[in-house]
């Protein structure tokens, strides 16, 4: 989450005039993440999150995201349900940009996830996959494997600027991933950005909720697990924590056992998931607005994860 769009008191009052939420009491920006502008709003009736959609958010995709959040909440999954205005609309406009209000969810993210957090996060991810079954809308993964080569072609010079020789290494990775990419795995709604800052825990350490579904799409469930392994199971020194990974997968399988094909696919999917986040971080590196309250994330963090996958895919003991 971040803040790229400033909102005046008058603009906020006019926006809230369409809702039955009372008057604004407090309103402040949330300076985390890199995608949208987010604000914590407190009114005389409760607390909410106002999101103004920026950057990659395509207006035509927003109904999918908001309807998905409503679907998940209505099916018992702890996600931030969008708030409808008096006319029943959840997708609104402020300062000429699409915007939405959602419920404020209690809980805290884990800044330094433990093995226990990983187990809980894994179970929460499986719960999400099951809760999304039957959601009628569809959205292709526009940051999935078929799009990576095209994305990289726009940023080859940026890669070389970060690390001489990196472009050739990435070209080789992309070719190998294209040849080995799994097909036909169990699929459905995935989060696709299930990072520690998008998962909340209760005070006792149990899973509380997931937020920030604005990369959600239809893809292989095991790919979502791979994204999550990369996000949760690498230590600050770049080493892979296999104990945390096994705990995460065990937590997942509390609710949804993996098929043999999914287990076998996790190593290549994890390599691909590292590629996806390397590429989007590379794209963000030179394009984050100068006045934003956020720094772009280091693409080389995910290049180092790619290096681990190149040399030691057996680290992913999904079946262990």
From Swiss-Prot:
Gene that encodes it: thrB
Alphabetic keyword roster: Amino-acid biosynthesis, ATP-binding, Kinase, Nucleotide-binding, Threonine biosynthesis, Transferase
Organism name: Caulobacter sp. (strain K31)
Homology family: Belongs to the pseudomonas-type ThrB family.
The protein, known as: Homoserine kinase
Annotated disulfide bonds: none
Pathway this chain belongs to: Amino-acid biosynthesis; L-threonine biosynthesis; L-threonine from L-aspartate: step 4/5
Enzyme nomenclature, EC number: 2.7.1.39
Matching InterPro entries: Aminoglycoside_PTrfase, Homoserine_kinase_II, Kinase-like_dom_sf, Pseudomonas-type_ThrB
């Amino acid at each position: 989450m971040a803040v790229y769009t400033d909102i005046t008191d008058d603009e906020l009052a006019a926006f809230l005039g369409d809702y039955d939420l009372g008057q604004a009491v407090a309103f402040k920006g949330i300076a985390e993440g890199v995608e949208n502008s987010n604000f914590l709003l407190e009114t005389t009736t409760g607390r909410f999150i106002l999101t103004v959609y920026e950057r990659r958010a395509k207006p035509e995709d927003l109904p999918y995201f908001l309807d998905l959040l409503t679907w998940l909440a209505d099916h018992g999954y702890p996600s931030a349900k969008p708030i409808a205005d008096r006319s029943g609309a959840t997708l609104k406009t402020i300062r000429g940009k699409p915007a939405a209000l959602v419920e404020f969810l209690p809980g805290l993210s884990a800044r330094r996830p433990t093995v226990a957090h990983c187990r809980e996060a894994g179970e929460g991810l499986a719960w999400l996959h099951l809760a999304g079954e039957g959601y009628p809308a569809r959205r292709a993964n526009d940051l999935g494997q078929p799009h990576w080569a095209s994305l990289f072609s726009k940023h080859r010079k940026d890669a070389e600027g970060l690390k001489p020789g990196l472009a050739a290494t990435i070209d080789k990775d992309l070719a190998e991933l294209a040849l080995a990419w799994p097909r036909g795995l169990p699929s459905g709604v995935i989060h696709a950005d299930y990072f520690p800052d998008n998962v909340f825990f209760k005070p006792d350490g149990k899973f509380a909720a997931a937020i920030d579904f604005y990369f959600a799409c239809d893809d292989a469930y095991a790919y979502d697990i791979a994204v999550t392994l990369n996000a949760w199971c690498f230590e600050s020194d770049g080493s892979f924590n296999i104990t945390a990974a096994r705990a995460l997968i065990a937590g997942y399988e509390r609710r949804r056992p993996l098929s043999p094909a999914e287990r076998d696919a996790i190593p290549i999917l994890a390599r691909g998931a590292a590629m996806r986040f390397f590429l989007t971080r590379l794209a963000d590196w030179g394009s984050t607005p100068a006045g934003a309250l956020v720094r772009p994330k280091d693409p080389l963090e995910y290049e180092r994860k790619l290096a681990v996958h190149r040399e030691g895919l057996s680290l992913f003991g999904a079946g262990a």
